[in-house]
Structure formats: structure tokens, C-alpha cells
Amino acid sequence: MLLSAIASQTLLSSNPNLHFSNSIPNPRPSNPSLKLLNASSSSSSSSSSSIFTRGLRYVNHTVSNEESEPGGGETMVASASAIASAIRGASTTPVEFTQMIEKDHLKTKIILPSPDFQRLCLEQLDLFRQIVDPNAVLSIYVRPAGSYVMDRLELRRVTCYPSVNAGDVVILVGNFGIPAGLRAAEASLSSQQVELVSKHRAAVFPMVKHPFVVGFLVAELPVEAEEEEEEEEEEKPHGVNQFLSPEEAYALPASANTKSPRVKLPSVKVFTEEQRSYAINISRTLAMAYVMDQKTMLLQQSSWQNNVRMSKLVEQIRGPLSTMRTLSKMLSTHTKRNQISHDIVEDLIVQGDQIKDTLEELQDAVHLTKANIVRHNEEALKKINKTHNETRRSKYEHKDPIDGSQISSTRLSLGSGLDDSEMPMPPLALAPLQMHSIRPCDISNVLLDMVETVRPLALTQQRVVELGENSASLQVAVEEPALRQALSNLIEGALLRTHVGGKVEILSTRAPAGGSLVVIDDDGPDMRYMTQMHSLTPFGAELLSENMVEDNMTWNFVAGLTVAREILESYGCVIRVISPRSSDAALGAGGTRVELWLPAFPAAVSEANEA
């Protein structure tokens, strides 16, 4: 009796919510399509005639970008699946991948690279097809700017050539089993020039801008002509020899004419040395172009944010300045030389203090503008008279001892252990902006957890991370996930700025005017040193130099600070940057201090007042 079975084609990645993890690969394809070749017989044939079917052949099914299951579930994009396989191969820890497809990125407000970069991608991919393979399907995946300091890997497909649903944005997110798994996989991928994924018949080129992997170039290669001929030969029917007489059928063993199933894995086209070199150079060109594009967009965003912030600070200065002018006119009109009212003098002092505080914030805002960074180039720094600056700074310290930005190095040190150290000046206003649906968190618990997590990684890099002993347990009006993301940006930026043997100190305490104060100090280069390389100048010539430590340092500092500021300011927090933090340090080695002023949760404030 002949049993007919039709095996439905089921794709492993057809479920968009399916998580991929590191597992031992099955030697047989995970999604075979079982086909019974033509073995037709009439329905009226007698039971004495027996038909021997041929062996089952495994057919690898290549999924197109638009293909889906009959049930309606979306399949995983082939290029994304190839990247996932390459990352799993480079990772020493389990990795789970999820895929999302945004049909309209304008409504979801997903930030994509500039149109200039996307046009450059199309030109480079067209060059790839001309030189390497004219039938290759090429895709470019890049990492968004805010993902470099996270424990997960996020990739977005920005270009697919030839275009297949060009308006769709494919987002691939990889979650690593341990926080350090991403860094280890990134280091392994950075050392590889190309990864061949036979399962998907693709070549994955990491786009590396040391020390980061900024994206991937995926080339899905066509089937070789020899493979097509073999498949056609296997699919040809064998005609009369396929049907045996009853005597022959009973005379032969059952396995005599039955071929065992053969597993044929797809092969990847072998590049010539010249094609391989061209492909690697194209991936490097795209990596460098993406870095410059991100820096340009970061500068535009930072400049816009600083312009908004500066306009608000100017309005804050205008009120006290008008009051001071009015009081000055009153003094000149109603008093004689030796008859100055004490109340008027006190008002002048208060208004002067407000202007001083606002000017400090204005200085911090101006410190990171594009014009300021470009202005502090290498030639200008060489002309700085160090002795003159130190003399002028010492005069300011004696004249205005309550200026928080001019505190001496002993007061700025968090490791001194002095309980009576002078506190920085608080901001003018510190209140939560989102009163509703905020779940408060304990800042000390968050800092303790993050320091314990980052400490092993810092030790492997020969750096030290310390949390102040007198860190207070305080409730702040900031969501814990947002606070963790902002702090991870700032702490990792501080670690990247320090040299081997460097130190990062973190302290949290109660702010003088309410709320919490978190101080992050590092002993790395200060902003005067980090801005001397034209590091944020778009299309700067220094990007082609070999020693790019300062460039990466500044890029991560500004990127991390921008991300943290955008997150925390939405909760009413204030971020201040003091660089150099040590006035008596050598030129360029003054370190950086980052102050985070976090508003307290209203319930915590009322409990503190009752106590």
C-alpha cells in the first residue's frame, strides 16, 4: 500500500516573536521541504504492481523579504538572520534575537542616517555589484547612536539594494546572556574582515570604526550554476527504469533501489582575493562615512539643544539684571555717598548671586557648542600661556570663594573622606516635570548595582571604579530604566576617558536645596585636551590618522552626555559639566566632573520635612 505524505514547509524564523539563541546546530537543515518526485500510477492498477518511490530530497528554501507563512506570520528577513548567525558564532555567551519591521518610520519617529549617507550607500552597493557579483542582494545595517553604551545590540536596516520595500525599516535586537557578552562579541567581530554564512548563502562584512562595530554589510549571493545543474539533474524523472515488474520487485531487497536521503547544504561563492579586497574596502568606506554622518547629526542636535537652553538662560539673566539696574538708579537718586540702605545692598547681593549661577549654567551650555569645539584647535592651545591662566585663576579664587566652579582640587576630590567638604552650588529650580505615573527609585541602590556590574570590566581594563562610602539612600522622581540608561552613558564615558591605571569616583548625596546630587569624577583628559584634535569637525582630515584615541574619546563623551541629558532633562533634572575639575593639574590632565541634580519624589520630600 502506498502512503502519500505532504510535508508543509515551515520556516524556523516565521514567528516574528521567536527568539534565537546559541544552540548546537542541527546537521540537517532546520526547515527542509520534503518533496516526493513524480511517481504517478493509475488508480486502476492492480495490487501486484508495486511502485518504489525515490528518496526524499532536502530543499533549502530562501526566504525573500516579503514572504510570509500561509497563516499570515512574517518571516525573519534573510539578511537579518545571516547577521544573527554571524554574531552567534562570534559570541561566547547565549544571544537572543528579535526582529521588528516598521512600515512607516516617519510616524514612529525613528531616527535614520541622513539622505546624503543613504545616497552614498546606494553608490557603494552598486559598485559592489559591478566588481564582486552583479546578482548579489545587498543590505546595510547600522547601529543607532544611543546603542553603543547599552548591554544589547540594536541594528537597523537603512538600505537594501536592489530595493525591496525600501520604506520598511528592519530592526534587529540582540540580547546577550551577560552584560559583558556584547563587548566580547564586538571585539571578536572587529578582528574579522568577513564572515561567510553558508546556511543563508551570505557574506557578512562588519563595518568597524575602532573600537566599535558600527554596522554590517550583508551580501546575499545567488546559487552557483553547478548547484542549479545538480538540482535539475536530480529532479529529472528516470522513466521506465523507475517501474519494476512484480518478479523483479520481489526478487530484490527492499533497499536495493532506494537511495538514502541526501542532505545538501548551500555553499557560498568563493571570492577571489581581488574581489575580497574590494568588498572589505567598501565596508570600511561605509563605516567611516556613517561615523562622520552621525557626528554631523550629533552636532546639529547638540547645537539645537544648546540654543534652546541658552535662550532660557538669557531670559533668567534678564530679570535680575533689570532689577539691579533699577536698584542702582534708586541708590544714585535717593542716597548720598555715605548713606546706602542696607536692604538695597542685600538685594544687590542676592541678584548678583542669581546672575552668577545663571552664568555658570550658560558657560556649561556654551562649552559643548560646535563653534567652541572648532575654535579650540591645536594651534590655539599651543599659544595658551599656562602661567597667565593659572595667575588669573588664582585671583578669581581669592575674590569669589563661593563660586562652585572654582573649588580647589582638595575640595573637588571625592576620596578625601572629609564630611565638611563644600557642596557645589545648586541650580535655580529643581522640580519633577512629570508628576503623574512616575515610579520613584532609590538612587543609591541603582548606583551600587551599576558599580558592581561595571567593576569587573574596569578591572580587566586596569581601571578602578569606586562608590563613595557616604552615599545616601534617596528616592528620586525618575523612572529606574531611564536613570540606568543615563548613568550607564556617563559612567562608561568616564571609563573611556581615563587612561590605564585611572580612577572613576561616584558619590550620591542629598542636595542642599532638596533632591539628590550625583557626582561622577574621572582623572582622564579634560575638555581642553579632548577638543584640540578637531574631533567633532565634520569630514575632518584627522579622521584618517592612525592615532584615533582622542577622536573616539571625545565622540563617546559628547554622545553619552547628549543621550543622558536628553533623558534626564525630561524628568526635570539638571546636568553640569566641570572640565577641568582640578585647577592645579597639568595642562590637559585636569579630569572631568559631571554633576547630576535629580528632583526628589514629593512623598520623600514630605517625609524628610516631617522628620
From Swiss-Prot:
SUPFAM superfamilies according to UniProt: ATPase domain of HSP90 chaperone/DNA topoisomerase II/histidine kinase
Places the protein is found: Plastid, Chloroplast stroma
InterPro entries listed in its UniProt record: Chloroplast_Sensor_Kinase, HATPase_C_sf
Membrane-spanning parts: none
Region (GAF): 116-300
This enzyme's EC code(s): 2.7.10.2
Residues the entry annotates as binding [3Fe-4S] cluster: C121
Cofactor descriptive note: The 3Fe-4S cluster is redox-responsive, binds 1 cluster per monomer.
GO MF term (any one): non-membrane spanning protein tyrosine kinase activity
Transit peptide as recorded in UniProt: 1-79
Residue span(s) of domain Histidine kinase: 312-602
Pfam families found in the cross-reference section: HATPase_c
Main location, first listed in the record: plastid
Keyword list, A-Z: 3Fe-4S, Chloroplast, Coiled coil, Iron, Iron-sulfur, Kinase, Metal-binding, Phosphoprotein, Plastid, Transferase, Transit peptide
Top-level EC class as recorded in UniProt: transferase
Disordered: annotated segments: 17-50, 385-420
Compositional bias of kind Basic and acidic residues: 385-402
GO cellular component: chloroplast; chloroplast stroma
The protein's required cofactors: [3Fe-4S] cluster
GO BP field: detection of redox state; photosystem stoichiometry adjustment; protein autophosphorylation; regulation of gene expression; regulation of photosynthesis
Gene disruption phenotype: Abnormal regulation of psaA gene expression by light variation and reduced plastoquinone (PQ) pool. Accentuated superimposition effect of light leading to PQ oxidation. Increased level of non-photochemical quenching, faster pre-steady state kinetics of the 'Kautsky' transient. Up-regulation of chloroplast-encoded photosystem and non-photosystem genes.
Magnesium found in the keyword field: no
Complexes and interactors: Self-interacts. Interacts with the plastoquinone analog 2,5-dibromo-3-methyl-5-isopropyl-p-benzoquinone (DBMIB) and with SIGA/SIG1.
Family: Belongs to the chloroplast sensor kinase protein family.
Task performed by this protein: Sensor kinase that senses the plastoquinone (PQ) redox state involved in stoichiometry adjustment of both photosystems (e.g. long-term adaptation via transcriptional regulation of reaction center genes of photosystems I and II) and state transitions (e.g. short-term adaptation involving reversible post-translational phosphorylation of light-harvesting complex II, LHC II), thus linking photosynthesis with gene expression in chloroplasts. Autophosphorylates, probably on a tyrosine residue. Probably phosphorylates SIGA/SIG1 in response to plastoquinone redox state modification.
Protein name from the UniProt record: Chloroplast sensor kinase, chloroplastic
Organism listed in the record: Arabidopsis thaliana (Mouse-ear cress)
